[in-house]
Amino acid sequence: MSKTLYEKLFDAHVVHEANGETPLIYINRHLVHEVTSPQAFDGLRAMGRSVRQPSKTVATMDHNVPTDSRDLAGSGEMGRVQMVELAKNTEQFGITLYDINHINQGIVHVMGPEQGLTLPGMTIVCGDSHTATHGAFGALAFGIGTSEVEHVLATQTIKQARAKKMKIEVRGKVRDGISAKDIVLAIIGKTTMGGGTGHVVEFCGEAIRDLSMEGRMTVCNMAIELGAKSGIIAPDETTFAYLKDKPYAPKGKDWDEAVAYWQTLHSDEGAEFDTVVTLEASEIEPQVTWGTNPGQVIGINQPIPNPAEMSDPIERQSAEKALAYMDLPHSIKLTDVAIDKVFIGSCTNSRIEDLRAAAAIAKGRKVADGVQALVVPGSGLVREQAEKEGLDKIFIEAGFEWRLPGCSMCLAMNNDRLAPGERCASTSNRNFEGRQGRGGRTHLVSPAMAAAAAVYGKFVDIRNLELH
């Protein structure tokens, strides 16, 4: 019987499945951070339980860490307490921790892949909704809640219902200047933010295959933003080349055996999907969100939609509310909209290729007057590599702030946030009301588009700019 990649991954991890009950599946890798883990560890202590497989759990600090210093208290008392608790809990339960001063510290979804903790065929969980990022490697990866974090720590398993199967194919090749972020925003614009609800999405097609692993991670990272449980991409030679020689990747004969297995991880010919969506890559423009969810997105040269022209009353009401919050009129182009801040970072776009793309725009230019622009590498290793390449100097000379690794302005859980009414061009994944700070207005874009907005003080079409 033909199977989808998702079915192969799920079936390979079923520990127990009884009639009428939710299947119990095995978890290969558990990634932990400071925000969703304290209560889980407290639960273990209260019941006198240990962590069943400490070697399969790795922790880092990311959400609360300040990016202008390595002071634990730099983001406030709550952040300090959570980071101190994580250090205490990981030491007590024998779990590896990349703390705030470790070179491997970083955003959990950047750190995992670059260490080789993320491998094809795995099941991976983390108490964070963007765990889908790891699906770029042909892994089944999804976010879990704090009570589930405790369950995985104690049992290395989790109850998980089977999801519906969705295929999103991006046909052909993208045009110059189009990034993975533009691809996934265009996908969400077509499916809407609820189009993938109840599904695990497999991304495929020539445009997806052409992406680097970092680009694929950007796409899978935002699968959750179309409502999906997770997103996956079948592994291939690009995957294997990325993983080769990573610290936690198999070595020697084990590597050869692993690759032989990984090559079987693809959807069979004739495998059936519940939903199929197709996009033409050549039609994708640089994308910018105009509203308060990632599905409210347009190409840079398109006008903001007029809610009155929307036939669906719910969609119309949502658009009206979004435009009111964003303080934007309909029918104008976003190239007419000025911005106050720029954020280049997050688990979506803080890897070395993202920083190179932004630096190519920033080089030889200056941040516009009145604009604050932050560049926040996704990990200590990304920061180290960027500095080896001189990217930090490019950003600093252009007037960007070169920060330390962390989640930063993606979410208002640290000191990097928007003030009420401020408008931000952001490479993050969510533009919800208040996401980057109470009353803040977020526009999601690619790293190159964000850098260009910083330089020009407004949104521009990067395809018209000379790269350096």
Curated annotation (Swiss-Prot):
UniProt KW Oxidoreductase keyword: no
Catalysed conversion reaction: (2R,3S)-3-isopropylmalate = (2S)-2-isopropylmalate
Residues that bind [4Fe-4S] cluster = C347, C407, C410
- Annotated region Disordered: the residues are 53-74
- Cofactor(s) the protein needs: [4Fe-4S] cluster
MF terms per GO, please?
Answer: 3-isopropylmalate dehydratase activity; 4 iron, 4 sulfur cluster binding; metal ion binding
- NCBIfam families in the record: leuC, PRK05478.1, PRK12466.1
The entry sums up its family as follows:
Belongs to the aconitase/IPM isomerase family. LeuC type 1 subfamily.
Protein name in the entry: 3-isopropylmalate dehydratase large subunit
Q: What is the organism lineage in this UniProt record?
A: Bacteria, Pseudomonadati, Pseudomonadota, Gammaproteobacteria, Pasteurellales
